[in-house]
Regions:
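Short beta-strand elements
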Residues: 129-141
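Short, compositionally biased P/S/T/A/G/V-rich stretches that sit at domain boundaries
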Residues: 23-45
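Bacterial N-terminal signal peptides that target proteins for export
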Residues: 1-8
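A glycine-anchored, Pro-Gly-centered beta-turn/N-cap motif
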Residues: 46, 70, 109-111
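Short acidic/polar inter-strand loop motif in beta-rich domains
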Residues: 81-83, 120-128
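Short amphipathic, basic-aromatic surface patches that mediate peripheral association
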Residues: 53-64
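Short coil-to-beta strand junction motifs in C2/discoidin
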Residues: 64-72, 132
Length: 141
């Protein structure tokens, strides 16, 4: 008990954020996340392949604590910023690729759509600061 109190006191005195300890994995400063295809402004017919790019880090499966690695999440028509203290949502607009996929076959209804990648850590939290691609806009015919 004394040891636990000493560790807690030391953490509080040094300003270590205990609640966020397992969150906010740092990415290398030169890491760069991007959408290879489709290009910004593209018009696609029906379902299409979306290809993901990452430089300066590796792609791994969800749950892996491999250093300098994460897995892709594709945000579709999402305008709200992600909360870095919460896991990336998983729903029809926040697609998870936890098996380490670097491409996906996407089927969207006709119209204008935005796509953006976010790299998640082992527990689906965004990196700190968040590693996100440029948001692109496509037209689906």
């Amino acid at each position: 008990m004394k040891g636990t109190r000493a560790i807690l006191a030391a953490a509080l005195l040094t300003g270590l954020p205990l609640a966020a300890h397992s969150q906010g994995t740092r990415a290398p400063a030169d890491a760069f996340l991007y959408i290879i295809w489709p290009p910004d402004g593209a018009t696609v017919k029906g379902a299409f392949w979306c290809r993901f790019g990452l430089r300066g880090m590796g792609v791994t499966q969800a749950g892996s604590n491999a250093p300098n690695a994460g897995h892709h999440h594709l945000l579709i028509d999402v305008d709200e910023p992600l909360d870095p203290n919460e896991p990336i949502p998983q729903d029809k607009t926040h697609l998870h690729f936890g098996a380490g996929q670097t491409e996906a076959h996407i089927d969207l209804p006709p119209g204008k759509h935005t796509l953006q990648l976010v790299l998640g850590d082992a527990k689906h939290f965004p990196f700190n600061p968040p590693l996100v691609s440029k948001k692109i806009t496509i037209m689906v015919k």
